[in-house]
Amino acid sequence: MSLEVSHLSFAYSKRGRLVLDDISFSVKKGDLLAVLGPNGVGKSTMFRCILGFLRDYEGSIRLNGLEIKSLDHREIAKHVAYIPQSTYPVFNYTVLDVVLMGLTNQLNLLAAPNQDHIDEAYAAMESLGIAHLRNAGYGEISGGERQLTLIARALVQKAKILIMDEPTANLDYGNQFRVMCRISDLARDGYIIILSTHNPDHAFLYANRTLMIYGGKVIADGTPENVLDAKLIKVVYGVDVNVEDYRYGSRRHKLCVPINGGVGKHR
């Protein structure tokens, strides 16, 4: 399984500004790619191009060597799943119902899931630690549990490339940690993960690749340890930080520590 984006450019109108300008990168089995950049730089637009929702782009997006434009949405859904930010539902479906919605690309119109499908849904929920919530209302569980439910839905879809738009947005610290650990586990299991985040520490802690987008262009691409430094973060986010090494036993990570700009303890 592979995804290659080459010289991708996109504007929402023929005379409009380029939202994406000559974006190129590739991912392979087991990659966890963290896409960083300030609001409005085109991260979500890039995801919509990869998912086949926007097709009037220049350049190429190749899924296993096939141009995305040549594939219909059902075919794309066999390989690529989208996990949005956790949202509150209009109707309070059960967690199991939401997970089973991942079967849409596999069932004919008006067909119902069978017991094998339900068993697959249970297995996906079990792998993410939420099987005990199967009969709970989706609107009644925590934000972190809702996010894990959406990931389980993607697993039932049987896609091996998971596109995640800020998967920890609006989650508290504990739920951010739990969700990111599960996502990291999926990459180790061979899934390709592409996620957007506004937190450089998520890239340091969980990703093996990072892509920094600024002004519609890729300005950094590589391992987080090699490309994320204080100078780059200052340029992109306007925040002065120290990028420091953190060691705990045999584990070693880098972390961002803000050093000015009004940061301090309230007394």
Model-identified regions with their sequence ranges:
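The feature captures the beta-strand-to-loop junction immediately N-terminal to the Walker
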Residues: L36-P38
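Conserved ABC ATPase "signature" region
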Residues: L100, Q115-L133, K158
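Conserved ABC ATPase signature
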Residues: G137-I141, E145
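Catalytic Walker B motif of ABC-type/P-loop ATPase nucleotide-binding domains
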Residues: L162-E166
